[in-house]
């Protein structure tokens, strides 16, 4: 049985009525679902239709990135409002949902220590139940023009991360490498840490079942065609050996900041000592 549901992949609230119907159907089909988490953007919180999700969503994760107007303009997120407007919309959201998580990013070009410090002070003033602070992640596939225009030199991130830890850990418990919560039992994270298996539904979703990782097609057209013909959306499958699975579990527990010797002994028959 499923106990938790995470609706991600961007602005999942763009069709509020469809999302509400989907959540209602999921809870009807799987009554064991007790926790529902949804991703959204700040401006949605100012939409009166957001009330359609009240009572259906337990955790609303809001992608803010920064409250600094200069950073928002550089990343083209000023379309979601000014830093002050974002602040006000999150304050409204906290009245509607049991848990509000604010997603922030550090490592932007031009994001000085002073700017990051102000962002963290703003967060502490809002006092959301959860805060997630991701480093800006650029890969070899990212266009060099994008890297040069928005990414800060990599060597500044360690100092910024230390500032985040120093400012947040007095009022928050660190839940994982990036996540902080008001208590140490918040139960929600973007990353699947506490479940050995998970099922992904929809275009671009990932599943880990048994010894295999499944990837659904990212093409909406192909996904609709596959589902319409009675097939599933899986386009790729990768089978892992026992050693690789153990490495994966170990890395997830390291990411969460806790390693359970009991888990590895009872579930996998492996003695970490």
Q: What positions do the PLM features span?
A:
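C-terminal scaffold of the Radical SAM
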Residues: 1-270
